[in-house]
A protein has these predicted regions:
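Short amphipathic alpha-helical/adjacent loop interface patches that line ligand
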Residues: 21, 65, 109, 120, ...
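N-terminal leader segment of winged-helix/HTH proteins
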Residues: 1-35, 82, 134
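Pre-recognition alpha-helix immediately N-terminal to the DNA-recognition helix
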Residues: 12, 16, 43-47, 107
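N-terminal helix-turn-helix DNA-binding core of bacterial DNA-binding proteins
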Residues: 22-68, 155
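Charged/polar positions within long, soluble alpha-helices
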Residues: 29, 110-117, 145-148, 152
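Charged, amphipathic alpha-helical coiled-coil/dimerization segments
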Residues: 25, 77-135
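C-terminal regulatory/oligomerization modules of transcriptional regulators
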Residues: 1-6, 130-155
């Protein structure tokens, strides 16, 4: 007879993580879509809005979003086509190109954020008692710092 896997079994742990992630994305995705954004675009706009000068070097945006350089180029191409960001070359070092949030991008983000914030509040924050949420957030930061320390710019 096969023994039931324990809660600490690596496959069980990852299964729970994947199921939770997929479920949360399914609940949050309509808030992005209602504003003409994908989750990745929403993430990029938030990162730009919280950065000094509302801009990031393309390489830094790639690092923070976990995208390759070609992936972030495609992302910024889409955002630029929609008037949400512009590319700017650093006059002091022409090798650096920045993605900069436009007024239209800031406005779109401002329109999407209340609904997004409410969905995160409902589907994530309110699902746990405060002490468990605090423990989860601490654990997520430990894991994030171990796995992607370069992604810490906006937390």
């Amino acid at each position: 007879m096969t023994e039931a896997p324990s809660d600490r079994d690596p496959i069980t742990v990852m299964g729970l993580l994947f199921e939770t992630h997929e479920g949360l994305i399914a609940k949050l995705e309509p808030t992005w879509r209602d504003h003409g954004l994908s989750g990745l675009e929403m993430n990029a706009l938030q990162r730009l809005s919280r950065s000094p000068g509302r801009r990031l070097r393309m390489v830094d945006l790639a690092t923070q979003t976990g995208l390759s350089t070609s992936g972030v180029t495609r992302l910024v191409d889409r955002l630029q086509r929609n008037g949400l960001v512009v590319r700017e070359t650093d006059p002091a070092d022409r090798r650096n190109t920045y993605a900069t949030l436009t007024q239209e991008g800031d406005a779109r983000l401002g329109q999407a954020l209340p609904e997004y914030r409410a969905a995160v509040q409902h589907w994530f924050i309110e699902q746990l008692p405060p002490d468990q949420l605090d423990s989860l957030l601490a654990a997520l930061r430990i894991l994030r710092d171990a796995l992607r320390p370069e992604a810490t710019a906006i937390t």
